[in-house]
Amino acid sequence: MKHFFLGLLLCMLGTSTLAAQESDSIVMEVFRQKGYPFYEDNEVKLLPTGREKYDDLFACVRSARDFIHMDYFKFQQDSICHALFDILTGKAREGVEVRIVYDSFGNRFSDLPLRKPYLDSLRASGKRIEEFDRVRFPWINHLRHRNHHKIAVIDGEVAYTGGMNVADYYLRGKPRVGEWRDMHMKVHGPMVNGYERVFEDMWWRTTKERLDSTRYLSTGHCDGHTKMAMVERVPKKSGKAIRETYCIAIDNAQHIIQIINPYATLVKSIRKSLEHALKRGVRVQIMASTTGDGPVTPDVVGQEMHKLMKKGAEVYYYDGGFHHSKVMMVDGLFCTVGTANLDARSLRFDYEVNAFIFDRNVTAQLQDIFYCDIHKHCVLLTPDNWKYRFPLKKRVSGRVFSSIKGFL
């Protein structure tokens, strides 16, 4: 909220023209004051299904000439992972440099973790595959500061990022939750260098090996017109970055805020920003999933959504499976797509990276997906159906586990 009131005060004093500006211009100005890096002249392609992501990514990997860098929370050892690594093996034999980082915690608690014999065979074929912060007993020492990235950079020309790990449930769903929905994107342009820097930093943290940035950063030109800001959460360095930028965007919204997030247990600062937006008359629409991949998180999310509903927010429950997307649209003017959930783990502990995209066409595409899902798969939460959707057992669970939601 302090960012909103600072802008308001400057307007009242006549020292700023923010009052005549739309929210995207105000947010860009505040981001620049805060030092968040901007990249202009990009092209963005949204990839709203697992099939679209993997078809596009695999084609790009097959055409790689120089290097392939991948940094993922987890690679699930299943059919889609085998298909990807088979392509990467072929590229490594052609002389393409292949470097892969995966998170130890994400792998260990995967349904189908990468096993040592398989990893050894992959490494023997010429790929560098490294495990970030190996989990050892006692595991509790490694629960914080996990690598939650989902990034691929190919030849310094193309980057992929968003909510999808590498697993076939993005194509086939899961028995307990049904279809697994998510949002990824493909980026051309200067922003690719930002993702390459994120990879190089994680590579160093994992291997203590410094990569020569001049070797991997692109100086090429892109004819795109999309302006993007990179927001990276690095523990002990930029720990407040994701929640700060979310709050700046929400605090300066003028008309409508639309959010899809799978684990919206919410930290206090974001919840307060949303409540103040509602008081200003801003329309707030949030899409939450009826099911989830954890036993109690949906109950805690339900408590938060109930509170916001009572404050005037429109809460839509997605019944078409599990919506794992991490996106927000503001005023139809700008949006964010990234890896961060709206929970304490993403906002206070893990390594995360989000892109804020200042492009009305990209934002409109996300809004179209949002409205389509509302029409086809969602039910509006009301005081009447709240008790039906959340019977006493779930309400008690939500209240009890809300007290420790910072650890969920």
Regions found by a protein language model. Name each.
Residues T17-L408:
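Charged, low-complexity intrinsically disordered terminal segments
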Residues F4-L13:
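Sec-dependent N-terminal signal peptides
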